[in-house]
Amino acid sequence: MEAYCVKCREKREIKDPIAEYNKAGAPVTRGTCSVCGTNVYRMGRTEAHEGLPKPEVVRKAKKTQPRKGKLVIVESPAKAKTVGRFLGKGYTVRASVGHVRDLLRSKLSVDVENDFEPQYRVPNEKREVVKELKKLAGKAEEIYLATDPDREGEAIAWHLMEAADIDESRTNRVVFHEITKDAVDEAFAHPRTIDMDLVDAQQARRILDRLVGYGISPILWKKVRSRLSAGRVQSVALRLVVEREREIDDFNPEEYWSIEADLLPEGGQKSYRAKLARINGETPELPSQGGVDAVLADMRKAAYTVDSVREGKRRRNPSAPFITSTLQQDASRKLGFTARKTMSIAQQLYEGVELDGEGTQGLITYMRTDSTNISEIALNETRGFIKERYGEGFLPETPPTYKTRTQSAQEAHEAIRPTSVLRQPKAIKKYLSRDQFRLYQLIWQRFVASQMNPAVYKTLSVEVVGRSAEKNEYLLRASGSQLEFPGFLVVYEEGRDEDQTEDEEGDSAQIPVDDIRENQTQSLEELYPEQHFTQPPPRYTEASLVQVLEENGIGRPSTYAPILSTIQNRGYVLREGKRLEPTETGFLVNDLVVEYFPSIVDINFTSNLEDELDQIASGDAEWVDVIREFYGPFSERLEKAEAQMPEQKAELEKVGRECPRCGHDLIIRWGRYGKFISCSNFPDCRYTEPYLETIGVTCPTCGEGEVVRRKTRKGRTFYGCSRYPDCDFTSWKQPVAEKCPNCGGVLVIANKRQLKCLDCEETFLQDEILKESEMA
């Protein structure tokens, strides 16, 4: 038998071995080194220990410190600071700083063969956090998990309990939808246990996303190129953006004309404008100027009389208070915020801002919600404020109610609103950053407006009939409205996308109503034909894409912003101004996923899966069953794609130049945002440069370089000179070769039909400029 000798520094045979038990009751063999005689020993049971009496070990009981105090765990330090101030002495408030456990990134981390059991681990950067929380929890008499009031927050609470080995019998779950003293006190007065149905719903979503992402992405790497990836919900969003782009590309504008007329009432002094609405009872179809000229000639010979004059009133109701999706949409339209920026600033307002005399106060309710409910306390405070500030005429007799858009809305949640309408935006502006103030003002105005009376418009509609010698009948219509009572509009008006138009008539003040009566003769003063072209559908903005996702049941309040961020961060979609444009990579990934994984990008399928996740959250479905039902067909699709998807790896394309650093050939590679130029000697040489895509236009500034399409670091497209930095010409819009007919300045493409001059800012129809260029 051998043992390690500390003097010889190697294993030696034990001389005169003696088997015994040490003081701790462990079997050892003692003796001396057979070479140098030094005492040695070896741990472990041997045959010689058989029959030896095992000593009785008396272990001293550890002194246990009595538990005292209450530990509260929240997600963020800012929230911890606010909540801690409300709770006061006796409470220790700590932040987990988000999730403390997650699936391993290095592998699937889902045991498909064992009921899809997830394999969680604590990330290295969170081990110290978990260690501290475990230590504090061991000393605390009571533990309160006060994470956010949604599925994600419930899951964080459960992971905290598991990772920090927190005793469930001493643990309480508390939820509040606003961080105010009253709300926090109410939550701690009514604690509950962790809702495992909500945890399972979040866990099921996480596992589904992992199965899809880690299933499809390796196939794309193998068949196409590395760095490509696909996800469950974001693939649907990408498909919407790609299909809209193809609609735009395939669109053929069609010409049509409209006709307006200036009419003067008999005996009147003021004319008004009316629009041709019917020809012989039919909607006018005027596709070309030839047909318009014939109609104009006939209309000039017609006699016109007033057929009807109708006055009325129209009410315009306020919009519902914000939910997550509508907040993101309006912040995009009115403030130019991305969905991610909106949620980040809203989080700051929710967690609390330092106010003089009040300390840190949460300014808005929880920002991830799909419910339009309002608490009775908030409702009463708001009605009192409206009555005092604006007067009784602006206050409805009964509070307005709003229908929640989604069936899955959690009715216990509230709409996004200020925690107190008495904190008017201008009064607390000095405590907020510029963006915080703008978003808080938007939320405050929308909420107050939602509890006010409708705006009332006075409407006027005049119909005039013209009868020609050719026995044709022309119906012309003039209509308008004037604001009679502003109602909620004194506070707020909903934003619109650039392509959206007001659903309003013209100004009725332009119609001389006192001079017009039925059967009165009208004199035709002038006709105004106008050429139009049908327009393609606009590209999605973040606001309009969120709206479509919500309307189709894709995603939930907590996922809209991550979906939009993901498709942009992966380089599948670029944000051009406010518009979303797919990249070459986006087209490629979408087409492959649509062909080989059609259910993943099917809107109805994804919506139904969201409904099943809602059923898990409500306890009406088992998460394992939902995943098993999904994974069976999906795994078959994976096998089919692995076998049938053709390899599309492109040959490395040489640029025709040598690397300036090492002399090897330069080649074109694909990156996140498309092509770039790299050294073929990579990774030994890491030289790169942008791939300059020329557009066939000479630089208008220097006249020597070519205008090339470039990308910013964030992937946004712009146009510059190929001679940069010697020439600093840049433009966000694509320049064209033609010059401005007015000033000779640079023309850029403003939209599908128009060009705009960067110098004089005049706009021109593309067709007209191109025709003039061809004739010249």
Predicted feature locations:
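Intrinsically disordered, low-complexity regulatory segments
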Residues: 53-206, 215, 286-287, 293, ...
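Conserved short loop/turn motifs at secondary-structure junctions
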Residues: 68-69, 148-149, 225-229, 311-320, ...
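Metal- or metallocofactor-binding catalytic centers and their adjacent structured scaffolds
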Residues: 283-320, 520
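Short acidic, hydrophobic short linear motifs in intrinsically disordered regions
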Residues: 306-309, 318-331, 358-366, 536-548
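C-terminal or mid-to-C-terminal helical accessory/interaction module adjacent to the motor/catalytic core
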Residues: 179-261, 312
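Basic, low-complexity terminal or inter-domain segments flanking catalytic cores
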Residues: 2, 23-24, 39, 43-71, ...
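Core structural elements
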Residues: 205-215, 233, 263-265, 314-326, ...
